[in-house]
C-alpha cells in the first residue's frame, strides 16, 4: 500500500516507476472502531483503507515530493488556500471536494487527482447539495456539494494542472537536455495508459 509505505519513508521511485501506484483519490473516512482514517483509490482499481488521518498522508506525500506541506504554491506562485487545487507534481493535482459531514476538527475534504487517465462523471445525489462522483470501475463516491460546484472544483483543478505542466515544460525546453525530455515522455506515457 503506497500511502502506508510513504509514511515509513520508502523510496518515492516505487510510485513513479509503477503505474499501479498512481493515486485517483483520497477520501477521509472513519474506521469501524471510530478512528479517523483514509480510503485510497488507485488507478489499477484497488481501494485500500489506511489507518492514518488524511492530514498525515498528505503531509508525508508532500515531504516525499520535496515540498513544504504548509506552503504549497499555486502554479502562478501564490500560496494556495485550504480548498484551492494543490499540485504535488506532474502526476498529482488534487481538487478538494467535501466528502463527509464535519465532526470536530477532522478533515472533511476528499482529494481527487485530475492527472489520471479517467474522467470524473458527476451525477445528482440523494439529497439537495449532494452528488455522486463516478470514476473508473469504483462504486460511486457520495460528496456533500452540488454537482455544479463539484464540476467547478474539478475544472479549477484541471486548469491548475495544465498551468503547472505548461510552466514545467517551458523550463525543460530552456534546458535543452534530451535526457530530461525522454524521462518526462516515459512518465507521461505510463500515466496515460
Provide a role label for each language-model segment.
Residues 1-193:
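Eukaryotic intrinsically disordered, low-complexity regulatory linkers and tails enriched in Ser/Thr/Pro
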Amino acid at each position: 500500500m503506497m500511502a502506508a509505505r510513504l509514511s515509513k519513508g520508502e523510496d518515492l521511485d516505487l510510485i513513479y516507476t509503477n503505474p499501479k501506484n498512481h493515486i485517483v483519490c483520497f477520501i477521509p473516512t472513519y474506521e469501524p472502531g471510530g478512528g479517523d482514517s483514509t480510503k485510497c483509490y488507485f488507478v489499477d482499481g484497488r481501494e485500500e483503507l489506511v489507518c492514518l488521518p488524511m492530514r498525515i498522508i498528505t503531509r508525508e506525500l508532500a515531504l516525499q515530493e520535496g515540498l513544504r506541506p504548509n506552503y504549497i504554491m499555486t502554479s502562478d506562485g501564490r500560496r494556495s488556500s485550504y480548498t484551492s487545487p494543490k499540485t504535488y507534481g506532474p502526476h498529482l493535482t488534487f481538487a478538494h471536494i467535501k466528502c463527509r459531514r464535519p465532526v470536530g476538527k477532522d478533515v472533511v475534504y476528499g482529494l481527487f487527482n485530475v492527472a489520471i487517465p479517467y474522467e470524473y462523471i458527476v451525477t445528482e445525489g440523494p439529497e439537495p447539495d449532494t452528488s455522486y462522483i463516478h470514476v473508473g470501475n469504483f462504486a460511486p463516491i457520495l460528496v456533500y456539494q452540488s454537482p455544479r460546484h463539484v464540476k467547478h472544483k474539478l475544472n479549477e483543478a484541471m486548469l491548475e494542472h495544465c498551468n503547472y505542466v505548461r510552466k514545467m515544460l517551458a523550463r525543460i525546453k530552456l534546458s535543452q537536455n534530451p535526457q530530461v525530455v525522454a524521462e518526462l515522455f516515459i512518465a507521461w506515457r505510463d500515466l496515460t495508459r
